[in-house]
Amino acid sequence: MPSTSSHPDRPLRAVVMPPGPQLFAAVRDALSGDGPAVLPLAPGQEAAAIAALRPSDVDGRPLEGGSGVPADVAVVIATSGSTGAPKGVMLSAAALRASAAASLRRLGAARGERWLCCLPPSHVSGLQVLVRALLSGTEPVVHERFDPERVLASGADHVSLVPTQLHRLVELRADLSVFATILLGGAAARPGLLDEARDLGARLVTTYGMSETSGGCVYDGRPLDHVDVKVGDDGRIRVAGPVLFSGYRSGEPVPRDGDWFVTSDLGELSGGRLRVLGRADDVINTGGEKVVAGAVTTVLGGHPEVADVAVVGRADPEWGEVVVAVVVPADPSRPPTLAQLRAYCADRLPSYAAPRELRLTPGLPLLPNGKPDLVRLRSQI
């Protein structure tokens, strides 16, 4: 299971530490030859401290055998945990390869073209960049930290980004046509950002997927080859195909509808194109009405004075929950008011879905994969 010191320690241990001892592979030290390749991950050990471990910190005692995974599992990926505790998703090499091959076919990417990886390989989006490069017969260009100017000068043909990274490229007003393709995944992007990037020459492909589908399985609303998508009567998106995962590391049941994996996302299909509405477990119950937080986020993201936004529910004795908009202003000296945002929502959303509270912030707390950390946001309000 690939990991990073930026993973939250406690929820990460819940994923990687079922009964039995575990090991932590210090890949950087192993490759450079100046440290141990494998270190024990002890209960209570903080992930940030693991990176600082050296041979003198390891007592060398042999470890007893721990719990294993099925033979076909190539990697265990921790989900982002954007709305709750992360899960360990078991992926086979066949699933990873099926996803990467379908992606290359859809993009028309030729063998020998290079991929830039500036997403954490501990997340499925970053890992799949490496797999696509492998299938392309090239060595990936890897940037451990995101530097917009280095990204533009990387010489790579394709790159996978999250909206926050794309926003930083757009701020430079640089020529984005240097990439044959920019895959955009993670959190939903505000409509204005996509338009601004395309005006700068970006050839954008928006993606939908998750760890359980080996990454993006729907490009620009249409499923990849050999992937089937439908929406059930409950509004949840279902996915079938060779890209699906083998199960959860913890052994918890996989939500299924026959051969279909039932996601936690709500969506609608029109003309064979999928539109993602938001997460089913991110619904705000206010005054007896159900509000999909993702739908409100999408609308508010189109306001010209909003640079970034997240929508969460806050417990309220009168309404049960109230809709709270956490906004990063486009111009901090002239932030939008609650009245302006509610007026903007008036002809775009039902009245009960408009935010009742506004919190201004210089930046949203983000997870390593670029998604807003909604658990942390809820705790802050």
Task: Please tell me what each predicted stretch does.
Residues 223, 232-259, 279, 291:
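Conserved ATP/PPi-binding loop(s) of AMP-dependent carboxylate-activating enzymes
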Residues 350-371:
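AMP-binding/adenylate-forming catalytic domain of the ANL superfamily
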Residues 12-14, 18-19, 61-78, 108-114:
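Conserved pre-ATP/AMP-binding loop-to-beta segment of ANL
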Residues 52-58, 90-169, 181, 205:
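AMP-binding/adenylate-forming
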Residues 73-101:
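Conserved AMP-binding A3 loop
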